[in-house]
Amino acid sequence: MLPNIMTIRNRIRASVLVGITYSFSVVASDAADPYLWLEEIEGDRALAWTEEQSERTAARLAADPRFDQLKADYLASYQSEGRLPEMYTLTQADGFVYRIAQGPDHPRGLLQRTKPASFGAGEAAWETLVDIDALAEAEGHNWYVDAPMIRFSPDGAKALIPLSDGGSDAVSMREFDLAAKKFVSDGFRTPLARQMIAWVDENTLAISIVLEPDEATTSGYPRILRQWHRGTDVSEAEVLHSIPSDHVMLAPFLAQTNTQRDMLALAARSFTDLTVLRVSSGQPPENLPLPVDIVTAFWGLRGIGDELLLRLNTDFDADGKVFSAGSIIAANLPRILAGDVDGDTYRTVFTPNASEALPLSSPPTILDTSAYFVVLDNVVSTLKRARRGADGQWQVDNVDVPAGRQGGTLTLLTSIDPSADSTLLKFENFTTAPTMFALSQAGKLAKVQEAEATVDLAPYETRQFFIETPDGARVPYFIVGKKGKWDADTPTLMYGYGAFGIPMLASFEVPYIGPMHQIWLERGGRFVLPNVRGGGEYGPAWHNAARGATRQIVYDDFAAVAEDLIARGLSRAGRIGFVGGSNGGLTAGVLATQRPDLFGASISLVPLLDMARFHKLLAGASWMSEYGNPEIPTEAEPLLRYSPYQNIEPDGDYPEMLLMTSTRDDRVHPGHARKMAARLMAQGHPALFYEAREGGHGMAVNDEGRAFNSALQTVYLLQKLMDGFDPRTPAN
């Protein structure tokens, strides 16, 4: 396929820009950037600007006669009694599944639990532990709870409950008595801060927490690990280990099987340069040869008997025995802790073929003597069961999924309960309402609940196409549309991400936009989900192909999918809109500035956009292993070639962008979206900006906020792609 002339023009312009303005963008960016004041998150001038722009955006989009009905439709979907929660909002421990149940009467939610087999038995089956709304009102705080961050004591009697102020990543952990259903007076309690905790025993915690500014890394994560005993102040806890401030984080985690439990620590120089440590009082830290990925800091490690199961991000050489990246291996923990390490300390459990991958966000779930894990095959999920044979070797079998539940996405509940006798498995795709199954030790699936769709999706179907890129990669994408109506006149909404090895999968609710694709289909649109490089759809190599200096590949892949849609007669230039959040918000900005000939609408949610300064803003330094270091000229050059904020031109012909963020986002700085909108407007380009005062990196923490955000975005898309307006002209 020949490159589009717009691609050539933008690359030439970017090359010139890099050569001329490197000192402007990196070396002297503080002096040359006229919008640095918008990086003052709570600054009076900045907040006044965000309020003015948010009111202007709401005045246009919320005043649209379709807005109220759209918001009501979204709210009905979010609050449907038959709606199934996203798996990442659940956690499992001590034989129970825990959830946060939000609704009209409890917008912040109720922390509840039930047995996996009773998951779909109705509200009566759920035991309420904490009324978060009542707690927030009593204390005068904007409290929310993130269930997967709950940490349970070894005996299962207590839990540390994380309270987030407005959805921020910083939390206050409080000890809770699960039997008495109340917080423990004089129990463990931490100040509001970024922190990671693991129980050592019932009276001792391992905790990394930012108590003072110098205890944070440049990414904002904790760099000091302490051992904290009951009845003492956390600030007085013994320091076990610390890392330099230019590393990413230091976090305790549990390595546990169904027979043993050990507290270890993860020292992250970057998201990909990781070291596992054994730390103990009065002893120097000991490096352990455990190849892990970054999710270990949050989920820990689990296994069976004396072996931990590890997913490899890179090839691993154990005394000359090489295990390939992307595979699952078993590591003998007692031998590793004893220093008795050779090639026989590790064994292969599963190695994917060229079309398969293990999704990064779905580590194996352990049930007694079996391990269950999801494998993607050309981005479609299959379920595997691994068991150790009598000879100690691992055997892997397929687990049959019930009829009508193939051809989509399977998600296992990430269990932190090694004694569990069952767990949950969710099936979904774009047009099939999710079904929740209880998965037993024997590998049997029993349906416990099926969601109720609020939109009739029977008239729609999903197809999968593949494109071949100029460099020989085969990139798939899903397209969802009305049966029998595959033409170029249907407005198309594309969603994407493309980074950190995170795969984009067929789902009933899409990350950051929820059920928007359903409403879009119902209104006459079409939905497209590309599986570009940078993600994890085909394992670590697929991710690594678009890291650092080769990151432009991501945007070329997205553009190639758009061009393929046009070549197949499935869309037209200017009738395609793009939406993405976080790194996907960066993608939205790049496509709007590099390929305005293709995209008639662009929604950039909680985005990175200033790639000359991303490493200086909040958690940005932790992402340099993905994007590159703007302080190093050879790494800054490719960054500035695509950085949206640096590539806005006065004579550019860009689609009107909608940029949305949250004041409480303490992960991706709201200054990215603020500055991008301000620069676009200053150069005479149409742009819309909206900033929610709460919500964190998810932009909303309750159903009302989610429905409002979704309705704003949908009205914008209707105006730009369906109403007959020129996509580059603001709607009246």
Residue ranges and their predicted role:
Residues 223, 227-267:
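Polar, glycine-rich mid-to-C-terminal structural blocks
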